[in-house]
């Protein structure tokens, strides 16, 4: 489908909506939608996402925002889709599919990935996306007290600027696509830990401000033991603060580790793909997402 084949206007309930590309001055519109659908994004979080992707807004005749959708190109043949929001009063009336079709047309030829809420799952399924994995959102106020013993073959140290090239390579192996622009933006606003083997980085975890507090991610590690060793120092530094992690890992021991720290089960989303499966079959895996929108 060509983008020019999709109408720039559509009737949504009593409104005639017009779609236009997202512009630099649309922060207020996009953040307004986040608040309307009860997403935790602060204005700073939306600003970061807008700097990394492109997308569309649907607005009515008096410039009220009705829906949004974004995509984030990573390398030459892959993209993440996210920030798909529709004003609560207009959900199920077709605005989401209308914008999704525009994004799919823009991304023709790319393998695509997204993380679907329960409410949006059927929309993406109808567009040809297939489920890949469940992502567990864990969050809470970090408790004071001992964590379960963490045993890893690699020592862990604080992330240094000189690590960044090696961390990009690790992330590409785990994620399945090159996303230098995303990582560089995250490095600029994050702290982190690095697992070291034979003097070289073997895994890493980042933490940054997001939503109600801070989010841990991405976390890239060889195994669960390395992932917990990377995360543990970040938890200890943030006792009494709100943290979140979004993870594929569903092992009882990993959940027990997070439970002990106060990061309780909150919600799940479904990772879905259109095109070939990427990542997950190399020496390192993603144990924590950078964000639902960025993977």
Q: Predicted regions span which residues?
A:
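Glycine/small-residue-rich hydrophobic helix-like segments
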Residues: 201-257
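Active-site/acyl-donor-binding loops of N-acyltransferases
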Residues: 2-6, 122, 127-146, 208, ...
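Conserved beta-strand in the GNAT
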Residues: 57, 63-72, 78-85, 194, ...
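Conserved GNAT acetyl-CoA-binding A-motif
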Residues: 105-118, 239-249, 269
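Amide-forming acyltransferase catalytic core, primarily the GNAT-like/NAT-type
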Residues: 129-215, 225
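Active-site rim helix/loop that mediates acceptor-substrate recognition in acyltransferases
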Residues: 7-10, 24-70, 172-192, 196
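A short beta-loop-alpha structural element at the N-terminal edge
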Residues: 16-29, 154-166
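Conserved acetyl-CoA-binding loop-helix of GNAT-fold acetyltransferases
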Residues: 86, 92-105, 126, 223-236, ...
């Amino acid at each position: 489908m060509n983008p020019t084949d999709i109408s720039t206007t559509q009737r949504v309930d009593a409104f005639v909506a017009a779609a236009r590309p997202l512009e630099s001055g649309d922060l207020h519109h996009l953040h307004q939608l986040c608040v309307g659908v009860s997403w935790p994004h602060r204005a700073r979080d939306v600003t970061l996402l807008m700097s990394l992707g492109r997308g569309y807004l649907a607005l009515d005749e008096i410039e009220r925002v009705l829906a949004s959708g974004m995509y984030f190109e990573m390398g030459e043949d892959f993209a993440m889709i996210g920030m798909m929001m529709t004003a609560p009063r207009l959900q199920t009336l077709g605005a989401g599919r209308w914008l999704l079709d525009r994004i799919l047309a823009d991304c023709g030829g790319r393998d695509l990935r997204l993380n679907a809420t329960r409410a949006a799952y059927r929309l993406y399924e109808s567009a040809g996306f297939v489920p890949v994995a469940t992502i567990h959102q864990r969050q809470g106020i970090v408790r004071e007290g001992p964590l379960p013993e963490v045993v890893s073959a690699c020592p862990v140290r604080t992330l240094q600027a000189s690590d960044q090239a090696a961390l990009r390579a690790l992330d590409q192996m785990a994620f399945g696509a090159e996303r230098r622009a995303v990582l560089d933006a995250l490095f600029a606003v994050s702290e982190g830990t690095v697992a070291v083997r034979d003097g070289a980085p073997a895994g890493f975890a980042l933490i940054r401000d997001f939503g109600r507090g801070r989010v841990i991610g991405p976390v890239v590690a060889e195994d669960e033991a390395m992932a917990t060793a990377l995360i543990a120092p970040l938890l200890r530094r943030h006792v009494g603060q709100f943290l979140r992690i979004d993870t594929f890992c569903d092992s009882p021991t990993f959940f027990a580790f997070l439970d002990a720290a106060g990061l309780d089960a909150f919600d799940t989303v479904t990772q879905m793909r259109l095109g070939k499966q990427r990542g997950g079959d190399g020496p390192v895996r993603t144990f924590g997402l950078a964000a639902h929108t960025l993977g």
